[in-house]
């Protein structure tokens, strides 16, 4: 890739500013926001807070900042603007209903985004108060079964005692999880399962519409 790019003007982003034009160092977060340090090869450095959560979103900030640098926007302007980023619907949407916090991240999913979501939740979620509603990931071809097994294993290992509900036939029979074929089938079980103070996180591929497992006000 480096060889192929030799004839082009290349801007790099990542976590180490000594190797990149722009770097973002994640400083931790909560359900509704996070902090990160945005650094530029030219020496500017900013500690920022924004409404997005997760290490993966800090990397996205670095990518956006690198593009801005490429078109000539000054670092100070980039830093002032990036903190106003907001996600569209069904992407980490937080709703609190009757003492329960619902996170609707149901717009889409793939193995990488599922891993990122679980890693983010692990920063602050109490496994004993966590309910995961995970919809199947589509268009995985021959790796479908293995990826869904790995997702369930990751969830159960990361959050001992978690209440795990899977939606979609791609999951197959997964010990430790309640299995449903369709998102609408989850509603009644979820209503009986949640308790005051719980955190419910829902994510899956767009085709499984896992938001339909949540109360209507949280969709």
Question: What role is predicted for each listed range?
Answer:
Residues 1-101, 126-128, 153-163, 169-176:
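Acidic, Mg2+-coordinating active-site environments of NTP-dependent enzymes
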Residues 2-6, 115-116, 145-146, 176-178, ...:
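Short amphipathic alpha-helical segments
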Residues 9-14, 213-219:
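A short, gly/pro- and small-residue-rich
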Residues 63, 194-203:
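Short SAM/SAH-binding signature in class I
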Residues 87-90, 106-179, 183, 205:
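Active-site beta-alpha connecting loops in nucleotide-dependent enzymes
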Residues 89-92, 210-215:
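ATP-dependent carboxylate/acyl-activation modules
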Residues 100-104, 131-132, 199:
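Hydrophobic "anchor" residues on beta-strands that sit immediately upstream
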Residues 187-195:
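Short amphipathic alpha-helix with an adjacent loop that forms part of the alpha/beta core around
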């Amino acid at each position: 890739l480096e060889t192929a790019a030799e004839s082009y003007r290349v801007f790099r982003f990542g976590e180490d500013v000594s190797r990149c034009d722009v770097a973002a160092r994640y400083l931790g977060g909560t359900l509704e926001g996070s902090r990160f340090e945005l650094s530029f090869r030219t020496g500017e450095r900013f500690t920022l807070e924004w409404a997005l959560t997760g290490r993966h979103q800090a990397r996205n900030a670095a990518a956006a900042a690198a593009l801005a640098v490429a078109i000539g926007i000054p670092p100070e302007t980039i830093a002032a603007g990036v903190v106003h980023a907001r996600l569209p619907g069904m992407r980490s949407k937080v709703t609190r209903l009757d003492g329960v916090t619902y996170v609707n991240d149901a717009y889409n999913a793939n193995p990488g985004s599922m891993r990122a979501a679980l890693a983010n939740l692990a920063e602050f979620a109490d496994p004993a108060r966590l309910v995961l509603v995970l919809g199947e990931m589509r268009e995985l071809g021959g790796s479908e079964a293995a990826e869904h097994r790995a997702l369930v294993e990751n969830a159960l290992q990361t959050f001992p005692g978690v209440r795990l509900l899977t939606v979609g036939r791609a999951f197959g029979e997964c010990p430790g999880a309640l299995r449903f074929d369709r998102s609408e089938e989850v509603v009644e079980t979820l209503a009986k399962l949640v308790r005051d103070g719980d955190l419910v996180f829902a994510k899956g591929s767009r085709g499984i519409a896992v938001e339909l497992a949540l109360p209507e006000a949280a969709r």
